[in-house]
């Protein structure tokens, strides 16, 4: 059985939350914020190979027109900023995701992971 790397899962989840933001779909999707916050503790976001992986994943996802954040005109860095500043996933996180967690991680703590990613510039020009 082949297992996807944490880095690939991380990148896919970033694109996924951006797609959900662009399609205005929060329902049961805030779980990705929690997942990202946990994965971020296990990977090195300054690994140069991660930038290449992001580019490869974007090119792969771009083929699917429903993957809005992978299209050429999408700016993932800016989308992440909007997700944080608008608290787009907060209600769903508090009403759905937080009830599913074995270890409680509140929204404000989970969303800090996106701010770390924004500050790193990892998705700048992506």
Task: Tell where the protein language model's regions lie, with residue ranges.
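Structured mid-to-C-terminal alpha-helical surface segments
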Residues: 1-126
């Amino acid at each position: 059985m082949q297992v996807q790397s944490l880095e690939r899962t991380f990148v896919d989840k970033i694109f996924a939350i951006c797609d959900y933001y662009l399609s205005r779909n929060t329902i049961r999707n805030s779980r990705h914020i929690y997942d990202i916050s946990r994965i971020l503790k296990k990977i090195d976001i300054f690994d140069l190979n991660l930038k290449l992986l992001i580019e490869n994943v974007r090119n792969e996802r771009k083929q699917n027109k429903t993957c809005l954040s992978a299209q050429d005109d999408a700016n993932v860095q800016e989308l992440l900023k909007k997700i944080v500043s608008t608290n787009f996933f907060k209600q769903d996180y508090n009403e759905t995701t937080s009830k599913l967690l074995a270890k409680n991680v509140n929204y404000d703590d989970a969303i800090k992971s996106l701010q770390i990613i924004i500050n790193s510039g990892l998705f700048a020009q992506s």
